[in-house]
Each structure stands twice: as structure tokens, then as C-alpha cells.
Amino acid sequence: QMCIRDRSVSGAGKAPMDELVTQSKDFLEGKKISSKNFTKQIAFNLIPHIDEFVDEGYTKEEWKMINETKKILDPNIQISATCVRVPVMVSHSESINVEFEKPFDIKSVKNILNKSSGCKVIDERKDGGYITPLEAENSYLTFVSRIRKDSSNNKAINMWVVSDTLLKGAALNTCLLYT
């Protein structure tokens, strides 16, 4: 249904990663910050814009995400996406809302996700009972946390998904799909 993808600076390459480090140092030292690889300052900031703007106010990155999801899962799936560049070095994360055809049991959803190859559920309902982008670094797993029923729709769930994009990017995911 809906996905907000938080993309780390590594998704843009090495120069943007270096820029995040430089901007962070400059910010903490009270220096003027310049942006070469981003449309705005990335250090201590979020940029709700990745790639160029195209149809209906979406960006190329958002359309790419929508089309890839349809290609992998189902061409008829209805999805909307917002992609945000975040001041995180490596891992991408997504806040996802999924609607099912009928009501479901949240425990069953967690069990199915936990049994999925390359997926690990870390979902404790307490402070720190979830995975963060930093904790997902250097792992080939995709972590799922904050799994809960959507309070506005009894056929939908919300969840938080994180993976190290340098290790588990599109190429590895494609290979896993074919195996």
C-alpha cells in the first residue's frame, strides 16, 4: 500500500558519504556548510527528494520503487512511495503499510516473516526492542520490527524494515528471488 523509504547516503555513492562526514564536522564546529552532492544540507537533516522530479510530483526514485515492487510482487498491487535521503551512512530503512484481503492474526504474520529466508524479526514492544540502520550494518539479513495492526484498518499492518544496502542491495535480492 504505502511505503516511506529512508535512503542512506551510501545509496548516492562515496562522495556523498564523504560530504556527510564533512558537513557533520562543519556543523559541530559552527562553520558554514556547503552542499555539492545534495540539494540541501544532509548533516542533521532529512531531504524528501531523491533523483529528479517527474510525473505527478513523484521523483524518479519513487517511480522506480513503485515499478520494481510491482515487477517483483504483483503488477496489480497498489502502492505509493515517498523516498527520503537521511543522514545515515549505510543502511536503508522503510516504514511500510500493507493491506491484506481479510483480517489476520499479527502472530501469524510475525511467524511467516521470521521463517522467510534472509529475514529476521526483532519486535519487542519496549524501548530498544527494534532494529536501527546502524545495527543492521554488516549483515546480509533484512530486519523487520515495529510490526503492528494499522489502527485505521483492521486488514492492514505497519512495520519497520531495515537492511545494509552495501551487502543486501538489489543485485543480491534478485539472486535470492531466483533461488
PLM region spans:
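Conserved small/polar residues in nucleotide/adenosyl-binding loops
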Residues: 2-6, 178-179
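C-terminal substrate-binding/catalytic lobe of Rossmann-fold NAD(P)-dependent oxidoreductases
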Residues: 5-158
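Generic C-terminus detector
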Residues: 156-177
